[in-house]
């Protein structure tokens, strides 16, 4: 099964992703991990014929819209976004497939809207992150400093695709072909080469 690019208007934003040829098969909405994109599911899709598989770039990732200035990425917002995507697809009930952060969002979406989610498939699920209580104030200070410094932060520019491919291979223990899949969908052309197209706000330290 091959996946083709698509773009979907959702609640005033653009949701991009990859989709199999729509069939009468099981409807599956796939959610990728942190700083990944819909291409995460390309190798898996080859082993899943007969599904109506939609893999989206979550907000701020891949080719999807970034959140508006002055807003931040959070879990409740991600849950609402998943349901809005399903609404835009015309899917009343569907299966959720998630990897890492996407698996965490999928599991919480299933808990928040069990009447919509038929099945939940979680790969390397990532739960909520929690630090020591006595570090709360320090984490908040670090988050605020990072937010205020963000406008002056320069994008990292790669002269070619080889460097970001190597970076993904080292960071995630990926093969070269799998790392290249993610990189080709996860970078944008800029002056001097390429830069990550993911929203820099996704890299902010956790506030609480």
Pin down the residues of each PLM region.
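Flexible "cap/lid" loop of the alpha/beta hydrolase fold
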Residues: 111, 118-157
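Conserved alpha/beta-hydrolase catalytic His-Asp/Glu region
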Residues: 152-207
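Active-site loop/oxyanion-hole signature of alpha/beta-hydrolase fold enzymes
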Residues: 11-13, 18, 54-97
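Aromatic pocket-lining residues of Rossmann-like dinucleotide-binding sites
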Residues: 48, 109-113
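Alpha/beta-hydrolase fold catalytic core
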Residues: 1-28, 49-52, 91-92, 127
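Conserved HGGG/HGGXW glycine-rich cap/lid loop of the alpha/beta-hydrolase fold
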Residues: 18-66
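Gly/Ala-rich beta-loop-alpha elbow adjacent to hydrolase catalytic centers
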Residues: 98-102, 106
């Amino acid at each position: 099964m091959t996946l083709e690019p698509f773009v979907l208007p959702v609640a005033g934003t653009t949701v991009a992703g990859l989709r199999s040829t729509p069939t009468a098969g099981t409807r599956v909405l796939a959610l990728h991990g942190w700083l990944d994109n819909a291409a995460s599911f390309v190798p898996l899709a080859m082993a899943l014929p007969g599904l109506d598989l939609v893999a989206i770039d979550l907000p701020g990732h891949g080719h999807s819209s970034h959140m508006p200035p002055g807003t931040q990425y959070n879990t409740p917002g991600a849950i609402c976004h998943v349901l809005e995507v399903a609404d835009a697809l015309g899917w009343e009930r569907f299966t959720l497939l998630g990897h890492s952060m996407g698996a965490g969002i999928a599991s919480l979406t299933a808990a928040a809207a069990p009447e919509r989610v038929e099945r939940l498939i979680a790969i390397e699920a990532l739960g909520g992150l929690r630090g020591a209580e006595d570090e709360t104030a320090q984490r908040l200070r670090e988050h605020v400093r990072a937010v205020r410094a963000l406008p002056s932060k320069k994008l990292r520019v790669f002269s070619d695709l080889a460097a970001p491919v190597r970076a993904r291979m080292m960071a995630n223990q990926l093969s070269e072909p799998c790392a290249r899949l993610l990189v080709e969908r996860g970078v944008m052309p800029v002056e001097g080469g390429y830069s990550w197209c993911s929203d820099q706000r996704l890299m902010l330290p956790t506030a609480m």
